[in-house]
Amino acid sequence: MFWLHGTSPKASEPEAEPAAAASPASPQSPKPAEKLATGPGPVATVGELAQPWAGRRFLFKDPVTSEPVPAMVVRLPDDSYWGFSLREPFGTCELEYVSDLQKLRSDYDYRADHPMIGNPCNHSVYDLLRYGSSSNGGLVRGEVVQGAGIRPPMAIEVRVDGKEIIAVRME
């Protein structure tokens, strides 16, 4: 079974700190603010994710192919953090973190009271607050609540070290 080790920030830590400045965009790097974690490494700061549902994209090295995989870490309402791959578990589509509830209604025909993960290719919707079965029978966050999705997104273990959020490993 794969469990994520999200932790809450300490009460002594400031509520927010300025986000890191992004380097100027170049034609070769359309998303310059994304950090690449090739092993356990920082992908965001506690200050960048100071509010519930705040998210930060990053790239994580696939343990099998060594290719960079688009990923995201989100602060949940219980002050824990959840990391997940934005690559569809059994396909080629890139998942999206949908914080705009109107977009969930219009693009996915799904009504929710909090952000979800969506698959724009098959209109599957994944709930960040619910657990679903993984391919090995364990439970992972991101239950499929609508559509043809086979399993939740691949989890990325994250932990807090001081003011940094560290991506540790992919499921």
Short names for language-model regions:
Residues F2-D113, V125-S134, L139-Q146, I150-E171:
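N-terminal pre-ligand scaffold of iron-sulfur
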Residues H114-C121:
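Cysteine-rich micro-motifs
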